[in-house]
Curated annotation (Swiss-Prot):
<comment type="function">
    <text>Catalyzes the reversible isomerization-deamination of glucosamine 6-phosphate (GlcN6P) to form fructose 6-phosphate (Fru6P) and ammonium ion.</text>
</comment>
<dbReference type="InterPro" id="IPR037171">
    <property type="entry name" value="NagB/RpiA_transferase-like"/>
</dbReference>
<dbReference type="GO" id="GO:0005737">
    <property type="term" value="C:cytoplasm"/>
</dbReference>
<comment type="pathway">
    <text>Amino-sugar metabolism; N-acetylneuraminate degradation; D-fructose 6-phosphate from N-acetylneuraminate: step 5/5.</text>
</comment>
<keyword id="KW-0119">Carbohydrate metabolism</keyword>
<dbReference type="GO" id="GO:0006043">
    <property type="term" value="P:glucosamine catabolic process"/>
</dbReference>
<keyword id="KW-0378">Hydrolase</keyword>
<dbReference type="Pfam" id="PF01182">
    <property type="entry name" value="Glucosamine_iso"/>
</dbReference>
<keyword id="KW-0021">Allosteric enzyme</keyword>
<dbReference type="GO" id="GO:0019262">
    <property type="term" value="P:N-acetylneuraminate catabolic process"/>
</dbReference>
<dbReference type="GO" id="GO:0004342">
    <property type="term" value="F:glucosamine-6-phosphate deaminase activity"/>
</dbReference>
<feature type="site" description="Part of the allosteric site">
    <location>
        <position position="254"/>
    </location>
</feature>
<feature type="active site" description="For ring-opening step">
    <location>
        <position position="148"/>
    </location>
</feature>
<comment type="similarity">
    <text>Belongs to the glucosamine/galactosamine-6-phosphate isomerase family. NagB subfamily.</text>
</comment>
<dbReference type="GO" id="GO:0006046">
    <property type="term" value="P:N-acetylglucosamine catabolic process"/>
</dbReference>
<feature type="active site" description="Proton acceptor; for enolization step">
    <location>
        <position position="72"/>
    </location>
</feature>
<feature type="site" description="Part of the allosteric site">
    <location>
        <position position="151"/>
    </location>
</feature>
């Protein structure tokens, strides 16, 4: 596991966007062999998306031969609702880049058969050749996508009931009214994420400090699903200084030292 520690959120976002651009360029995708990208929602990736939009508009990157799969979507929230993850992704990324509409994949939380929707999503990922780079964020309790504490570390795309902590955290997007927050979601599984050839997780702010500590220094546990990343063959956590406040001094200094030429 790599840990990239940046001074603040803006630099974290720039580093992450540059890494995405680098990986796409290195893959040199074509229509026959596209680059497959897994994408998150939430507040953490917004800065990265802003940098990617800027780079696309400046001609530094093209998404024409990129296929995307989003991590999750609420159950029962209309696609056109401003807080649906369909709306989020189009607002922050898809409407501003040259991606082909048919290459965008987001779970349908209003599908008549939610289990069939989840199974079809797994098949679509497999048909695309698997995910080259899966990007994610984490919650204060260390959940990745909507894989809440207690989720199996080999789980696949499925329906999940959201914890009270997650509902409370997400209520900030719903006028701080927990009654408006959907209580279920469709989410890729921990196993789905772990199947990606690379995983990059964005962690920012003091509220994620304990989760970062568990991710880097803790034991692998289903109670902190982010810890599964320790078992991935090629994983990166990109964080800011604020998220590092609970790391041991030795851990912090170690990663600052070995990554000093990559910051």
């Amino acid at each position: 596991m790599r840990l990239i520690i940046e001074p603040d959120y803006d630099k974290l976002s720039k580093w992450a966007a540059d890494y995405v651009i680098e990986r796409i360029h290195k893959a040199a995708p074509t229509a026959e062999k596209p680059f497959v990208l897994g994408l998150p929602t939430g507040s953490s990736p917004i800065g990265m998306y802003r940098e990617l939009v800027k780079a696309c508009k400046e001609g530094c990157i093209s998404f024409r031969h990129v296929i995307t799969f989003n991590m999750d979507e609420y159950v029962g929230l209309a696609i056109e609702h401003p807080e649906s993850y369909h709306s989020f992704m189009h607002r922050h990324l898809f409407d501003h880049i040259d991606i082909l509409p048919q290459n965008i994949h987001i779970l349908n939380g209003n599908a008549p058969d939610l289990t069939a929707e989840c199974d079809a999503y797994e098949r679509a990922i497999e048909a695309a050749g698997g995910i080259d780079l899966f990007i994610g964020g984490i919650g204060p309790d260390g959940h990745i996508a909507f894989n809440e504490p207690g989720s199996s570390l080999t789980s696949r795309t499925r329906i999940k009931t959201l914890t009270t902590d997650t509902v409370l955290a997400n209520s900030r997007f719903f006028d701080n009214d927990t009654n408006q927050v959907p209580k279920r979601a469709l989410t890729v599984g921990v196993g789905t994420i772990m199947d990606a050839r690379e995983v990059m997780i964005l962690v920012n702010g003091h509220t994620k400090a304990r989760a970062l500590r568990e991710a880097v220094e803790g034991a692998v546990s289903q109670m902190w699903t982010i810890t599964a990343l320790q078992l991935h063959r090629q994983s990166i956590i990109v964080c800011d200084e604020a998220a590092c406040v609970e790391l041991k001094v030795g851990t912090y200094n170690y990663f600052k030292d070995i990554e000093r030429n990559n910051l």
